[in-house]
């Protein structure tokens, strides 16, 4: 993750070999969807990703109704949701779940306004329910996902806006940075670029130049292997 940040700052193309980059991971995309909604309620892609993640009883029929209203009235999904709730145009259970989501985003946006970026992101993630959702996950990956969310908070605490971010809020500047990390800096497989990979993955590839990171006593080789006869 720290290598990715440094390469982005230096505008050096890179590729993560055999794995996902940090900002491509599902749990990070989930958290960013909430952050984008906090920054702007009318981000439709973020609305679709966050509205039922974690699951809160908002089904496909409800989302279809919101999409149809947004299409018919040329408005955002957020505005369509508000319109449908005011018009009582959906079943009570679905309406309650949808209103709970809208209220959550409004409350966390207003309640964190003016706070430091890292603190704001930490509170948004906590209120979203994502940490609890992944903590209770039974797929064996929940703890890793929670740790990635914690690393996202750490990344916002380290974040320093660039000169071109002048005029943007800290949150908007970070979201623009995240969008860049998720897109343009990812090199194609055969581009001239820095390749990030494990030592095991690098075996036999015959790169002309290789840097070994973490070559520290007790870490590489691992202390356990040093004890073997």
Regions found by a protein language model. Name each.
Residues 3-13, 21, 25, 29-229:
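Conserved helicase C-terminal RecA-like lobe
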């Amino acid at each position: 993750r720290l290598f990715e940040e440094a390469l982005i700052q230096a505008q050096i193309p890179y590729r993560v070999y055999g794995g996902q980059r940090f900002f491509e991971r599902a749990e990070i995309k989930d958290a960013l969807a909430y952050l984008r909604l906090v920054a702007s309620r009318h981000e439709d892609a973020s609305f679709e990703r966050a509205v039922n993640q974690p699951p809160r009883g908002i089904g496909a029929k409800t989302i279809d109704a919101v999409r149809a209203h947004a299409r018919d009235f040329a408005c955002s999904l957020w505005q369509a949701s508000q319109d449908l709730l005011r018009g009582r145009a959906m079943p009570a259970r679905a309406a309650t779940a949808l209103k709970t989501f809208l209220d959550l985003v409004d409350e966390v946006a207003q309640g964190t306004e003016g706070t430091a970026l890292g603190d704001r992101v930490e509170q948004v993630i906590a209120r979203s329910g994502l940490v609890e959702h992944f903590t209770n996950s039974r797929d064996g990956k929940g703890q890793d996902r929670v740790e990635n969310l914690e690393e996202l908070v750490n990344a916002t605490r380290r974040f320093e806006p660039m000169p071109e971010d002048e005029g943007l809020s800290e949150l908007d500047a970070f979201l623009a940075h995240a969008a860049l990390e998720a897109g343009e800096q990812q090199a194609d497989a055969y581009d001239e670029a820095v390749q990030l990979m494990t030592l095991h993955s690098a075996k036999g590839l015959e790169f002309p130049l290789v840097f070994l990171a973490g070559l520290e006593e007790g870490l590489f080789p691992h202390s356990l292997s040093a004890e073997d006869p």
